[in-house]
């Protein structure tokens, strides 16, 4: 490809609204342009990268036995109503109505649609298992699109769905997809970590996320410093290692705490450490209000609470709902005398002579003994903290930031039961299809790669997904001898199977070199002043100095350099 013909509108300045490095560089290097908040056009360079990522995905998915199909982006509301997700999914689901007042959704996921397709077709255990995948645009009306492709409203995704007759078959396919994802993310050049995660709005009973490690990542990864344990912060387990405090419980007593309404303020008023207090938070689920308790220096993990309750959704109760139920407001809430379900973290059970709200204005209880003063169900309910004991007993946990680029789910019968998708087992009895679901953010993966592969001059593409293999530069595009040598090199490299971007523009050398660094192709060849002597410069984009090479030896030198690159 000759660069004089390539549509590649580069920018010299960093766009003011671009926070993430990948957002800045992909805009500056002419890979994409923004059309609206969270909506982008992929220009030719980006399309080449995306196509290579998609090719790797197709190779590994098909190699793992999956079959590609393509489903519509517009989905009938009735399908989402069958599973209840039309109401549950919330405002992120983009909805529309056609001229006949029929309701539709722009696909955020395709569980309902794929289930509607197979429920009349996969009607016997003899036709199972099956794994179907597609690569397609997805849509989510993000409240605050940010970081370019890392959180957009329209994005490219690979989603796959497997159907099984037994749980054992699902487990096998889950591991099959886990292994395929490991190969995919390794091939595209990502440093990543698979972590235990929450299934969120998708549902199901087991899931792993694949995170690309990056400082800009919105997710916190918890990992052991001495083992392979890793989990999303929401799912990282806190070990029940607490023993009851060795002190005699004193009589429960009400005390006036004035306008102190935070754990920090109340602890200061009473002259007690925060870990001697009980933090109370009230949540609302479809089951009603529930009170969550953690130690004062800990934070309630609402995902753990949701999973413990088996709730479909969970949110913090409003002040009005709390006032109606407890005749009090946040800041003085507590479990004593509360007429609602109470779930507490293990650390609370170990407290003696602690502090909690009295459900009265400006009043708290002191000398609270959980085993004596209220009843609660105990479970792991808090967010872990750095330095906690690793759940597997090996070492302690540390935190890192990650970008979620993929996720695998064990859906079970969550969708098949709701949509009456059944098959006949060996005994002729109807059973719900057992499902798995497997997603990869294709456009997000491109952005995540940039977050890991760049320097102060621009992008450094891993060779597997670079838009071109080689950047060939005629340093002086007005010099006939340089252009002639460059043309010869261009033909030789192309004939040898390399994809080459040939900068034949009549621009200054500094502009060409800056653009080359910004675009970040793996190998660069400069055809300059020594071209008449049959000498060119060869260098790798990732580090390394330019090396003078005889033109006759160039092809072999390029092969050798390219093979040694990541």
UniProtKB/Swiss-Prot annotation:
Q: Which HAMAP family match?
A: Pro_tRNA_synth_type1 (MF_01569)
* Signal peptide as annotated in the record: none
Q: Gene3D superfamilies, per this entry?
A: Anticodon-binding domain, Bira Bifunctional Protein, Domain 2
Q: Can you list the GO cellular component terms from the UniProt entry? A: cytosol
- GO molecular-function annotation terms? aminoacyl-tRNA deacylase activity; ATP binding; catalytic activity, acting on a protein; proline-tRNA ligase activity; transferase activity
Kindly state a single biological-process term from the GO annotations of this entry: prolyl-tRNA aminoacylation
Q: Which UniProt keywords apply?
A: Aminoacyl-tRNA synthetase, ATP-binding, Cytoplasm, Ligase, Nucleotide-binding, Protein biosynthesis
What is this protein identified as?
Answer: Proline--tRNA ligase
Q: What free text does the record give on domains?
A: Consists of three domains: the N-terminal catalytic domain, the editing domain and the C-terminal anticodon-binding domain.
